[in-house]
Amino acid sequence: MAKRVCIIGCGAIGSLYAAHLARVAEVHAFVRRDDHARALNQHGLRVSGKRDFTASLKATTDARKLPQFDLGIVCTKATQTAEAVAPVAHLFNEGAILSAQNGLGNEEIIAEQTKAYVIRGTTFMSGSRHSDVHVQMELDTATWLGPFEPTKTPYSLVKQAADLIVAGGLKAEALEDARPAQWSKLIFNASVNSVAALTELPHCPLFADQQELSSLGRLLHELIDEGKRVAADLGIQLHEDPWEMNKIGAQTNHPPSMLYDVQHRFPTEVDFLGGAIAREAARANLSAPLHTALYRLIKGKQASWTWGEEES
């Protein structure tokens, strides 16, 4: 079982992994801001909500100060993967790196930069970060892990990583093939995030309401059904039902990451979410008109933030 772990990116999900794993392993957080690192070193990391404890860990912005690791967990936005992993990629040459990120394509980016074994990871766990040293756990659901086939990751290594996460007090399941789980989360995430980004609504009960012709839940259901058809045509049998995932999440009023990005005019992860479904469908000559339309609308929305500046 891994004893030295590096959390790459300490937002809400990264903070949940860092705090829980710090109870059973030596945990280092690699973060972007010096004040974030100082706060974690001085005060530790508090978890509230579904859990209530404070964990001690080490944090830095300087990769030169980090040791070699048995396991890395990448928790950055998909758009930041290459930038975040590059400075520390050499610290896992004898270990493994788990992507616990949204969407498709992160494992490929990680594998390009490191000699480490890469592990596919998908989590439905959610939380809200109240400060650099306080995260609230909202959904305590499993992380699904499996080998990333191009790096020939041994299943035994995946099992060790899952066992470590469980030992820390979180839920995890090692799978021989994690693509069905990854696609379950992808379809759920692409559908919910796209609608949230365009409506600027949090993930609320409206996302599961199908009572009226105008009900937003009808659009969510159609998006999810379309994603299911693409997955089935690609030969992927889903691990979980994305519609059931949506119904559970819609009770939380959780603001999806792309809603936050749109509200702050940050680049979204749409290329790794709805864009990934649209691309995979197009590559296989399959139809995904709804996901493709929302993908284009969000790209257009992002373009609108700078269009006036470019014209002036």
Regions inferred by a protein language model and the residue ranges of each:
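NAD(P)+-binding Rossmann beta1-loop-alpha1 motif at the extreme N-terminus of oxidoreductases
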Residues: 1-52
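Rossmann-fold dinucleotide-binding core
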Residues: 102-181, 185, 191
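Short, well-ordered alpha-helices that flank and scaffold nucleotide-derived cofactor binding pockets
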Residues: 19-23, 86-90, 112, 275, ...
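Active-site-proximal catalytic alpha-helix in oxidoreductases
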Residues: 179-205, 215-226
